[in-house]
Amino acid sequence: SPRDTVLSTLPRRRPRSRAGCAPALAAPDSVSDALAAALQAPVVNCGAAQLDAQRLAPYYAAAETMPLWVSASGAGARAQLLRTALQNAGQEGLSPVRYRIADIEAYWSATTPAEQACLELLLTAGFDRYSRDVRRGLTGPHEADPSWQLRPAPFDPVAALQAAGTDGDLARLLETLPPVHSAYARLRTALARYRRLAEQGGWPPLPAGPKLAPGDEHEQVVLLRARLRSEGDLPLFALSFGTRYDAPLATAVENFQHRHGLHADGIVGTRTRAALNVPAAERAAQLRRAMERLRWLPRDFGS
């Protein structure tokens, strides 16, 4: 349709070169001029990114099309605050790719008004999507289970950004967009740990074998001990060696079982072995799903 094929007056830009980036029409004199021109079209094309102008226009309505992040001298302190938040979206269980961080990086050092307008709109689009995702969730509760009646609290990102008038206000807004529950903070800390473990290769699976109980002698005890040390259930300083299933190892198994909702009897049976063999990457994915569910809940558990 014509709506889908309309291009803005902004240029395409390759990440490593500005060659061929002349505007389709006369070059705008300022970032504001370029913004005004871009927002006239349904679709703004910035390199490979296609931005919905109608979605972005409300951010500029109250500001009379004045840029929110970028000036003639380039990206400002507010832009850097947002850039950092988008780069670190993985800490919230979200993907920076979803917020076009690569496109933002490609335009970060833009010098022409048209290219700076692209950076401006990419940042606004990133804020719009990120703020909604981290505040209310990527999906709704009903998509996980139609019977759930959870209703995330209303959130207006345009109003929130307008209220963040100073750099300090914006920093506080970005910090408080995620859930403020202590449970969410614990999940975020755990996610960082399991992401590191996954990046380091995780842990080798425990091969199929017999049930292991305290006092047993078995070659797999060495593997079990290494596995439990990888997650910290067995402290590195624990005096536990050899192929005998000793008391420190039994305590470590019980710790692991308790953390995973298993019967904490210290015996490595079928269910405990299966839990031990869940990869670190899958544990990280489980934490991301738990963080997503917390985003659906009221900001105050008592409300």
Labelled PLM ranges:
Residues S1-D4, S8-P23:
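Low-complexity basic/metal-binding stretches
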Residues C21, L25-S303:
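Auxiliary tRNA-acceptor-end handling modules of aminoacyl-tRNA synthetases
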